[in-house]
């Protein structure tokens, strides 16, 4: 019974066996036969790239739905503005600071302008 252990805790022959398998796999990939097959198939792979690039846009029909949901005149925009108003008024009542109401106007303008870019 061989109980000699290497540093990692596994027997030395197990580590060597794994390394030998890696070396055999690398030799198989880099052999002249494998490289010649790769050289013969690479032009065929390049011919197929043009066929894969042509496709139909499956999400083109959803563009109108996105505009209706997140556009400038949408229901989501109305909900965002109402939420901003509620939070702004609550913050003003809590702090009694008029600059918060000015900030509320600025935030509403920025969100309105930002959501108009959704085309």
Swiss-Prot record:
Oligomeric form and interacting partners: Monomer. Interacts with itself to form filaments; also interacts with TraQ.
Name it: Pilin
Propeptide positions in the record are 1-55
For the keyword Nucleotidyltransferase, the answer is no
Q: Which UniProt keywords apply?
A: Acetylation, Cell inner membrane, Cell membrane, Conjugation, Membrane, Plasmid, Secreted, Transmembrane, Transmembrane helix
N-acetylthreonine (modified residue): where? 56
Matches recorded under NCBIfam families: TraA_TIGR (TIGR02758)
Q: What does the UniProt record say this protein does?
A: Propilin is the precursor of the pilus subunit, pilin, that forms conjugative pili, the filamentous surface appendages required for cell-to-cell contact during the earlier stages of bacterial conjugation, and that retract after contact is established. Mature pilin is assembled with the help of TraQ and TraX.
Q: Which residues lie on this side of the membrane: Periplasmic?
A: 1-69
Q: Which family does it belong to?
A: Belongs to the TraA family.
Where does the record say this protein resides?
Cell inner membrane; Secreted
Question: Which GO cellular component term is one of those annotated?
Answer: extracellular region
List membrane-spanning regions: 70-90, 98-119
InterPro entries of this UniProt entry?
A: TraA
Taxonomy, superkingdom: Bacteria
Membrane topology, from the record: Multi-pass membrane protein
- Taxonomic source organism: Salmonella typhi
Q: Which residues lie on this side of the membrane: Cytoplasmic?
A: 91-97
